[in-house]
C-alpha cells in the first residue's frame, strides 16, 4: 500500500512539473496579453468617467483582481471607491447576495454614486453596471486595440472578446474589510479545528468583495429589486486559507485535470468548484501533517470522490455561504455526464498511477 502511495505521489509530482507548470506558463502568457488590452480599455473609460479608476495592477508577476475562470476565460474585478455612506445588509433573502443601503441620516448627495441610488435608498448594482457597460462599449471603439477587441452582446455583464479567442468579464466591485457577512456567520464550524483561531482572524480581517454581476440564484428571472443586489465573493479569504502544505499544488492538479478532461457541454464544472471542494477537504483533514507532500495522492482522491458525490446529488454548497448551491441552473444531464467522466478519471488515477502520463 505504501509503495502504491509513493508511486502515485511520484507520478503526481511529475504531472505537476510537466502538465501543471506548462498550463500555468501558458495562462500567465495569455494574462499578460489580455491585461494589455483590458488596461487600455479601462484607461479610455477613466478619461470619460473618473469614478471608474482602473485597479488592475501587476504585483510580483500577478495581476491584482484577475481571476482565471478557464484557460480562455477570465474575470477582472474593478474596485470602486467610496462605499462609506452605505450600510451593508445581508438578510439571507437572496442566497449569495447582499444590498448596500444609504445610512440613516446620510444625504444622497454625500455619495460619489448619487445617480445610482434607487428611490428606496439602495445603491443599485445593476444601474452601475449598465453605466459601466455603456462606457466600456465607447472605450472599445476608441482604444488602440479596437481591431482585436469587441463587446460580447446579449448579456447585462460587461464582457470583452479578445482576438476571437479569449473572453474577459470586467466586474465593478467594492472591497469590504473589517466586517464579515451574517450569511457566512456559521464559519468556522465550532467542532472543526481547521483553520485555527489566528488564521480565522486573518481571513475575517481580509474581508470579502461585493460584485456587480448577475446573481447565481436569479439568472433569467430577476426582479428589479433583486437585480440591485450585489454578489458576495471571498477570493482573497479563500487564497489565504490555501497557503500552506500541498494545498496549492493539489488545486493546480485539479484545475489541470478539469481543463483537460472535464471541459464538457453545458459547462457543469469550473475551477471554482475545484477550489470549493478543496476547502471542504481541508476541514475533513484539519492537521497540517495531512497536507504533507506525501499525502497529495490521498487528498486528490478524496476530492475527486467528493466531486462525484456532489454531481450525483446535483448540489455543491458554497464554502462560506452553504445556502448557495454552485450547481444552481446547471443542466442535470451535464452534471450526470460530469459525474461519469470524473468517476472514470478517479478510477484511472487510483488503479494505475502511470496513467497520469497520458492524462
Curated annotation (Swiss-Prot):
Compartment annotation: Nucleus; Cytoplasm
Knockout or disruption consequences: Severe lens and retinal defects leading to lethality.
Main location, first listed in the record: nucleus
Annotated GO CC locations: cytoplasm; nucleus
SMART domains named in the record: Mab-21
Family to which the UniProt record says this protein belongs: Belongs to the mab-21 family.
Protein name, as recorded: Protein mab-21-like 2
Native organism: Danio rerio
